Amino acid sequence: MKVETCVYSGYKIHPGHGKRLVRTDGKVQIFLSGKALKGAKLRRNPRDIRWTVLYRIKNKKGTHGQEQVTRKKTKKSVQVVNRAVAGLSLDAILAKRNQTEDFRRQQREQAAKIAKDANKAVRAAKAAANKEKKASQPKTQQKTAKNVKTAAPRVGGKR
């Protein structure tokens, strides 16, 4: 025996009961009663309707309120494990974590300086290559543009 759940009220629906609504996107919604179906069609939020399960959970009514309280009490304890990660030893990780801001800033500046120097060297090499290219190529004469006759402008409109 397959017991469904109402998408609106949250109550169980036994075989032979309930109404099915097939939406245009192909999803099937099962409602406990016409009352639940009407509430859904009127776009009423089930959390605000007093007889739905969602309302009872939200406002901690009856057995639903007791379930929530017992759930909150149980918490899983998290174990902290110190170990090497991604090819770094534990000592290396701790050393990185304990670095001062000044040391990190100096490292950043040094890395930026090295990158800038490398860029300057590449630019200088390109500039030298361009100068050699220009010197080896003979200057070509510029071609003059031909005057192309265009149609006279149309005065007035189409009609």
Curated annotation (Swiss-Prot):
Residues 137-147 have a biased composition (Polar residues). Keywords: Ribonucleoprotein, Ribosomal protein. InterPro entries: L24e/L24_sf, Ribosomal_eL24, Ribosomal_eL24-rel_N. The keyword Ribosomal protein applies. GO terms for cellular component: cytosolic large ribosomal subunit. GO terms for biological process: cytoplasmic translation. It holds the Pfam family Ribosomal_L24e. Residues 118-159 are annotated as: Disordered. Gene3D superfamilies: 6.10.250.1270, Ribosomal protein L24e. One of its GO terms (molecular function) is structural constituent of ribosome. The keyword Transmembrane does not apply. It comes from the Eukaryota. CDD domains: Ribosomal_L24e_L24. Belongs to the eukaryotic ribosomal protein eL24 family. This is Large ribosomal subunit protein eL24. It comes from Caenorhabditis elegans. The lineage of its organism: Eukaryota, Metazoa, Ecdysozoa, Nematoda, Chromadorea. The gene is rpl-24.
